[in-house]
Swiss-Prot record:
Keyword Repressor: no
One family name in Pfam for this protein: Ribosomal_L36
Protein's name according to its UniProt entry: Large ribosomal subunit protein bL36
Gene this protein is translated from: rpmJ
Bridged cysteine pairs (disulfide): none
Example GO biological process: translation
Organism, as annotated: Mycolicibacterium smegmatis (strain ATCC 700084 / mc(2)155)
Protein backbone atom coordinates (compact mmCIF):
# COMPACT_ATOMS: atom_id res chain seq x y z
CA UNK A 1 0.00 0.00 0.00
CA UNK A 2 1.53 3.27 -1.15
CA UNK A 3 0.38 6.47 0.56
CA UNK A 4 0.68 9.38 -1.89
CA UNK A 5 -0.58 12.96 -2.01
CA UNK A 6 -1.95 12.22 -5.51
CA UNK A 7 -3.22 8.78 -6.53
CA UNK A 8 -3.40 7.77 -10.19
CA UNK A 9 -4.35 4.52 -11.93
CA UNK A 10 -1.19 2.74 -13.10
CA UNK A 11 -2.66 0.05 -15.37
CA UNK A 12 -5.97 -0.80 -17.05
CA UNK A 13 -7.19 -2.85 -14.07
CA UNK A 14 -6.68 -0.06 -11.52
CA UNK A 15 -9.92 1.39 -10.14
CA UNK A 16 -10.18 4.69 -8.24
CA UNK A 17 -12.72 4.42 -5.40
CA UNK A 18 -13.70 6.43 -2.29
CA UNK A 19 -13.79 4.69 1.10
CA UNK A 20 -14.65 6.63 4.28
CA UNK A 21 -13.76 9.89 2.53
CA UNK A 22 -10.35 8.62 1.36
CA UNK A 23 -9.48 8.20 -2.30
CA UNK A 24 -7.98 4.76 -2.97
CA UNK A 25 -6.78 2.74 -5.96
CA UNK A 26 -7.56 -0.98 -5.95
CA UNK A 27 -6.12 -3.37 -8.52
CA UNK A 28 -5.56 -7.06 -9.17
CA UNK A 29 -1.82 -6.28 -8.86
CA UNK A 30 -1.20 -5.76 -5.12
CA UNK A 31 1.73 -3.44 -5.86
CA UNK A 32 -0.68 -0.93 -7.43
CA UNK A 33 -2.67 -0.40 -4.21
CA UNK A 34 -2.57 3.29 -3.24
CA UNK A 35 -4.21 5.54 -0.69
CA UNK A 36 -4.34 9.31 -0.54
CA UNK A 37 -2.97 10.73 2.69
Amino acid sequence: MKVNPSVKPICDKCRVIRRHGRVMVICSDPRHKQRQG
